[in-house]
Each structure stands twice: as structure tokens, then as C-alpha cells.
Amino acid sequence: MFGDRQRPMVLVLGLGESGLAIARWCARHGCRLRIADTREAPPNLAALQAEGIDAEFVGGPFTPALLDGGIDIVGLSPGLSPLEPALAALLAAASERAIAVWGELEFFAQALRALGTSGYQPKVLAITGTNGKTTTTSLTGLLCQRAGKKVAVAGNISPAMLDRLASAIDETALPDVWVLELSSFQLETARTFAPDAAAILNITQDHLDWHGSFDAYAAAKGRIFGATTTRVLNRDDAAVMKFAPAAGAADAARTVTFGLGEPTRDGDYGLSRDNGIAWLVEAIDRDAPDETTTTRRRKRDGAHTPDIAHKRLMPVDALRIRGLHNAANALAAFALARAIDLPAAPLLHALREYRGEAHRVEVIATIDDVDYVDDSKGTNVGATVAALDGLAQKIVLIAGGDGKGQDFAPLVAPVARWCRAVMLIGRDAPALRATLADTGVPLADHATLEGAVRAAAELAEPGDAVLLSPACASLDMFRNYAHRADVFRAAVDEIAIDKGATP
């Protein structure tokens, strides 16, 4: 997989989960290794040493001198921003010396290409987006399993792609389908990755400190597509639809869209409402032959006007995951699985089966007809907007934390529409208050999450939801978003005990 290089020397930058996976993979293939981390003793250093991986470790600031001594490839961990001055200087020096810079995804793509020479040709599905990646990735994996395929789910969702590939090789159990959750960080260094089908779920402001601008962030998301990849795009998101080919382009037939409205193009997906019931539907051409959508589109001449009908797939209420945003995620997962020609029937059964992921618009209790919803994973504005619009009921919102420099303005309309009140916590509560001041919704500041939950419970009325969807990172008050969720759940348990209810 390293071309003509014999025992290439690889510099791995950053010893997080992906960096450790790159180091393991390179050691497995006989590479000489130098590993650098800005920390003198990163947590995974002990694991590296315990596994007996022969590598030179260098702790401290990154400098171009790390490239000396015959480095052939730089393996870049996804958590490291290429805009950070010291790293930017090192990467510029690598470019001047024509040293390749690969992330874990590029190592994975090269590995699959090498395995392909021995006849291994799996299907690869990939998912990215600001929000909904983990839910859609897990759901897509389940759909493929229920269709009878051996499936590996990896990437940003964990485990690392290279670790999962290594274990599959060792167990002689290479999967039929890879389903990969990919972050913008992972996609930034993608060069030859070309999945069979890939979805962009949405693009809203996030990680701008890492990428430098929204346009750069969106461009990284777009690297998920190869030249022949079927594109699964959210037509309700203008930033996503910039990746749609022009109508007459050669690859337009390989583009499928999904959204919350009725689809109007053959093979697209959406929602249709009839007699008060919302359905997941597929648009079909009544006059089309019994062929795949892509084949029909390729054969169609300009004179044919499709006679579009909506084929009902299942009622939205049959999904166990709450919210219209999750209906969109379900459509994306279904579209990905259909893009590799998996049969519809087992996919629809799997959609009904899926229960969702922890801390993602998860109803954890209903007390006195008030739902308590854990969306602690909602660490950016787009996630909270999706949660508010998706639940579509009166809500007492708990929000705040480390805003990461985001613009909170997109929260104004959904807060004004859905919120009975907003409880503000964390470092950037003042910025949130300033943004939401003109919504007409009562705002209250709280020093602790526990206090915010108690106050929210007092304000909520039967039929409401108390929603923890912070729109912010958690590290100003908590170890991580899971710790924040644990504190929320404990506070809800206390309310249940006080009211004599079972959470």
C-alpha cells in the first residue's frame, strides 16, 4: 500500500485514537516510525509501549526538524488544526520536500486499494454533516446488517478505521460493507477516498476555529465524494446542495436527495402528509421501466416528463427515534443502503427497529406528562435548532456552555416559536442572553445545571418537554458531554423521586 517505498519512514503527528491507529497500522506493515505529540506524555503513549511498537517518540512543540532523517509520509491526527502556526510551518515544509501528508482516512483508502488487488471489493458508505452523523451511521449499519450483509461501522463513531480493518484481517472476517462516520477533520486530508455512496446531512457553523472559515469547513465536508460516488444530499440545506451536480452533468444521475417536504424528482425521498399522517416516501415515475433509479435517469431523454407519484415507505410515527430531524436521518440511511442495491423490505423493518443513540434527543423520562429529553450531544447551534424544530412541541430549553465562537442568531426563530422559557448556564450564557433577548421568551440564568433542571421542571406544563440541548461545548463546566448528560439525568431522577414518579 506504500507503492515503491520499502519500509517507509512515517512521522505520526498526535497520539490520540486515530494517531495510535495509524502507528499500529504502519508498524504492522514494517514502517519505521517517529511519533510526535505536543504533550510530553500523551495518554496513549503507554498503550504504544505496552504493545511493543518500535517507534521514536518526540514530545513538545512541532517543528520542521521532525521531518529530518528521511521522513516519507506524515500521518496527521484529525484533532490537529493545520492552521495552528507551528503545525502550519511543519506542513509547509513537508510540501516543499514533496512529503505526502495523510490522515487516517487516506491510509484506510490506500489499504482498501491494496486489498483490492487480491480481490477484496467491499461496498463503502460514508456519512458526514454537522449534526446527525452518529445516528445516521449507526442506523445505516443496522440497515445493511438486516439486509444480510456483514458490516463494519467505524470512523469518528469509533473504533478507528485502521484498527477495525486490522482486526477484520486478523479474524479473516472482512466485511461486505463499510459504514464510516467522518468528521470534517478526518476529511480535510482525504485525497483518494472514493466511497460507493456518501451523504452530507447538513452544514451549519461549527469548528470554525479549526478550519478558519465556514467555506473551508464546507469544502472539507465535500471531500467525502469521489468521482463515481452516489451523492445523497439534504435538499433543505443550501450549503449541502452546492455539492449537487448541474442538471445535465454526467454524474447528475448518481445524485439522490432527501428532505422534509414532498420529493419531486424520480428516486428522491421525503415526507408526504395525508389525513394528518406523515409518511416517509420515495418519488417514483409511474411511466418508468422496472430498473434502478440511476439507470432510468441515464436512459431518459429530454422529451420525457416524469409522472411522479409518492410510494409510501412507512409512517413517520413508526420510527422509534423522535423528531423530524430523525425522520430526515432515516431517509438518508435508507437512501444510502438503496444506493448499493440492498432490498427495501428488510431495510424498512430495520428502520422500525432502531432505538437511537444516547444523548441525542433521547427521552429519558416522562414525569407528570412532561418529557425530559437529553440532547447533551447538541454541542453546536445547528444541533439545537434541529432538536427544537424536530420535537415540535412547547419546550423549556436548557442551553449554554462554551460557545466556540459561534453565531447564536439561528436560535432566535425556533426559540421564539417553540420555547416556553430558556434556562441559561455556562460561560457563554451572557452571549446567549443577548442574542435571545428580543424573542419574548423568558430567560433565566443558573449557576448549575441541577438548578436549571429544577427551575425548568417548575415551569413546564403537561405536554411540554424539558430539553437539554446546550448548543455549546461542555468543557467549561463538565469533563465532556457525557458527564453533562449524567448530571442532567441525576437531576431528573431527583425530580421523579420528589414527585413520587418512576423516571
Swiss-Prot record:
Sites where the protein binds ATP: G129, T130, N131, G132, K133, T134, T135
Keywords, ordered alphabetically: ATP-binding, Cell cycle, Cell division, Cell shape, Cell wall biogenesis/degradation, Cytoplasm, Ligase, Nucleotide-binding, Peptidoglycan synthesis
Entry EC no(s): 6.3.2.9
The protein's annotated pathway: Cell wall biogenesis; peptidoglycan biosynthesis
Keyword Ligase: yes
Disulfide partners: none
A Pfam family the protein falls into: Mur_ligase_C
Catalytic reaction equation(s): UDP-N-acetyl-alpha-D-muramoyl-L-alanine + D-glutamate + ATP = UDP-N-acetyl-alpha-D-muramoyl-L-alanyl-D-glutamate + ADP + phosphate + H(+)
Subcellular location: Cytoplasm
Single Gene Ontology MF annotation: ATP binding
One CC-aspect GO term: cytoplasm
GO biological process assignments: cell division; cell wall organization; peptidoglycan biosynthetic process; regulation of cell shape
Family, per entry: Belongs to the MurCDEF family.
Cited HAMAP family: MurD
Purpose: Cell wall formation. Catalyzes the addition of glutamate to the nucleotide precursor UDP-N-acetylmuramoyl-L-alanine (UMA).
Protein name: UDP-N-acetylmuramoylalanine--D-glutamate ligase
Gene of this entry: murD
